[in-house]
Design a protein with these regions (language model features):
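Transmembrane alpha-helical segments and their cytosolic interface motifs
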Residues: 183-202
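Long, charge-rich alpha-helical interaction segments
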Residues: 148-181
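Soluble catalytic domains of membrane acyltransferases
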Residues: 1-140, 146, 151-152, 194, ...
Length: 279
């Protein structure tokens, strides 16, 4: 699978959510430098991919990863990589790098291989809980592609494959997505939104402080917000359960605890609605 890359970790989650089946992903190799991070990433089925700008000595390490990718494909598990080699929070597509062609051609020498162009379009790149569309295009038959170009030099095969893949991905990316406006009923639910904001305040405030002060690349913001939700929600749930059960009757504390489970998402949905009304 070959999606465009605009929203860091969120792009991989979109692919997983759309397919709902196991996949292995490629990610830039520099995030594997920490041994603990590398172990965690490999546990999540993410493999390191070096880029030309990382230096030729680093690119050699890709051949080790290629062997792992071969093993993944041999077992019938899809491999997903972002062929641009980096992310950009803009509509469109950066130049396709050589890595996707190297992997596809190498795999085609051993088995029937397809590359699936994938388009990901966000309603807003920086708003958490914004809309998103993921579209899978017609697979490119790599074996047929190579048979039709047997007489061409390798460099031309690479160039034509990258050009074809770029065209196929761009066909799937909506360059002017329609804003999906939320219902005006949100005004009536304003008190509920306030309650959700207060219940989840330690999570979203921590996330927003880190996003505003500690992250230079805003494209990582939504990934950070998601990670804060995943790691802090269980902790805060225990805290609220203790506080509410000691201070309120059960018939009031139970609904508040249930509301807390959805409060983080409700808070950001409300922010999205406010942004949407101003747009």
């Amino acid at each position: 699978m070959a999606p465009n890359h605009t929203n860091t970790l969120m792009d991989a989650l979109v692919v997983l959510q759309t397919r709902r089946s196991p996949s292995v992903f490629g990610a830039r190799a520099d995030i594997f430098r920490n041994p603990k991070a590398a172990a965690a990433l490999r546990f999540l089925r993410i493999l390191p991919m070096t880029r030309e700008r990382d230096g030729l000595h680093s690119v050699v390490d890709n051949y080790k990863t290629f062997d792992e990718i071969d093993s993944v494909l041999e077992h019938g598990v899809p491999f997903c990589m972002f062929p641009e080699g980096r992310h950009r929070a803009e509509r469109g597509l950066l130049p396709i790098q050589k890595g996707i062609a190297r992997i596809a051609f190498r795999s085609a020498a051993e088995r029937q291989t397809y590359v699936v162009p994938t388009g990901i379009t966000y309603g807003d790149f920086f708003l958490y809980r914004s809309t998103c569309d993921g579209v899978f295009g017609k697979p490119i038959d790599v074996n047929a592609f190579l048979r039709e170009r047997e007489e061409l030099p390798e460099a031309k095969k690479y160039a034509q494959f990258r050009e074809l893949l770029s065209e196929r991905i761009l066909e799937l990316v909506d360059m002017s997505p329609k804003v999906k406006r939320l219902s005006f009923w949100w005004i009536l639910l304003f008190p509920l939104w306030i309650a959700a904001a207060l219940l989840s305040l330690p999570i979203w405030l921590s996330a927003e402080l880190l996003c505003s002060r500690g992250i230079k690349d805003k494209a990582f913001g939504n990934s950070v917000r998601l990670l804060f939700k995943l790691f802090l929600t269980p902790i805060l749930l225990l805290v609220w359960a203790l506080v509410l059960c000691l201070t309120l009757p059960w018939w009031l504390s139970l609904p508040l605890l249930i509301l807390f489970l959805f409060s983080y998402s409700l808070f950001y949905d409300g922010l999205y609605w406010l942004h949407d009304r101003r747009a």
